[in-house]
Amino acid sequence: MVQAWYMDDAPGDPRQPHRPDPDRPVGLEQLRRLGVLYWKLDADKYENDPELEKIRRERNYSWMDIITICKDKLPNYEEKIKMFYEEHLHLDDEIRYILDGSGYFDVRDKEDKWIRIFMEKGDMITLPAGIYHRFTVDEKNYAKAMRLFVGEPVWTAYNRPADHFEARGQYMKFLAQTA
């Protein structure tokens, strides 16, 4: 089951959990109200997983690739990690399936507070187009993820502020309806 919580405001290494004391957990229903979808799958059989194929078919996730985020495998690792951690949005959904390793997706709630979502092997998440978010590996500095797309991949990040995009406006309308 996914673990998520409101982040503390402490400065420091973004790869640390940043759990407040006392803890402020966030459940799947609260994530769903933000448009975030989550599945737990068997990452050991991702190449032939009927459950993954069903999700891909139902949601039209027709294109995929695999990215390994670690110093030895990802060119310009430090630069990429900083880029992933910049607060941004996309004009399309962001779909990630963790095949190995772990990391954190941070998303903004309706009050603009950060929610940290711990992702580990077998976790698959969809972040809706228009949601402000960021990603970092955890202290293990390693994550292998499947990136899925509807149609041809478009991976353009628009750093905040990016409220003028239609995807952001549509997302804000969605949030207003889930109030």
Curated annotation (Swiss-Prot):
GO terms for cellular component: cytoplasm; nucleus; plasma membrane. It is an enzyme of class 1 (oxidoreductase). Ni(2+) binds at H88, H90, E94, H133. Keywords: Amino-acid biosynthesis, Cell membrane, Cytoplasm, Dioxygenase, Iron, Membrane, Metal-binding, Methionine biosynthesis, Nickel, Nucleus, Oxidoreductase. The keyword Amino-acid biosynthesis applies. CDD domains: cupin_ARD (cd02232). InterPro entries: ARD (IPR004313), ARD_euk (IPR027496), RmlC-like_jellyroll (IPR014710), RmlC_Cupin_sf (IPR011051). It is found in: Cytoplasm; Nucleus; Cell membrane. Its EC number is 1.13.11.54, 1.13.11.53. It catalyses: 1,2-dihydroxy-5-(methylsulfanyl)pent-1-en-3-one + O2 = 4-methylsulfanyl-2-oxobutanoate + formate + 2 H(+); 1,2-dihydroxy-5-(methylsulfanyl)pent-1-en-3-one + O2 = 3-(methylsulfanyl)propanoate + CO + formate + 2 H(+). GO terms for biological process: L-methionine salvage from methylthioadenosine; methionine metabolic process. The keyword Oxidoreductase applies. GO terms for molecular function: acireductone dioxygenase (Ni2+-requiring) activity; acireductone dioxygenase [iron(II)-requiring] activity; iron ion binding; nickel cation binding. Fe(2+) binds at H88, H90, E94, H133. Its cofactor is Fe(2+); Ni(2+). Pathway: Amino-acid biosynthesis; L-methionine biosynthesis via salvage pathway; L-methionine from S-methyl-5-thio-alpha-D-ribose 1-phosphate: step 5/6. HAMAP family: Salvage_MtnD_euk. Belongs to the acireductone dioxygenase (ARD) family. PANTHER family: ACIREDUCTONE DIOXYGENASE (PTHR23418:SF0). Catalyzes 2 different reactions between oxygen and the acireductone 1,2-dihydroxy-3-keto-5-methylthiopentene (DHK-MTPene) depending upon the metal bound in the active site. Fe-containing acireductone dioxygenase (Fe-ARD) produces formate and 2-keto-4-methylthiobutyrate (KMTB), the alpha-ketoacid precursor of methionine in the methionine recycle pathway. Ni-containing acireductone dioxygenase (Ni-ARD) produces methylthiopropionate, carbon monoxide and formate, and does not lie on the methionine recycle pathway. Also down-regulates cell migration mediated by MMP14. This is Acireductone dioxygenase. The lineage of its organism: Eukaryota, Metazoa, Chordata, Craniata, Vertebrata.
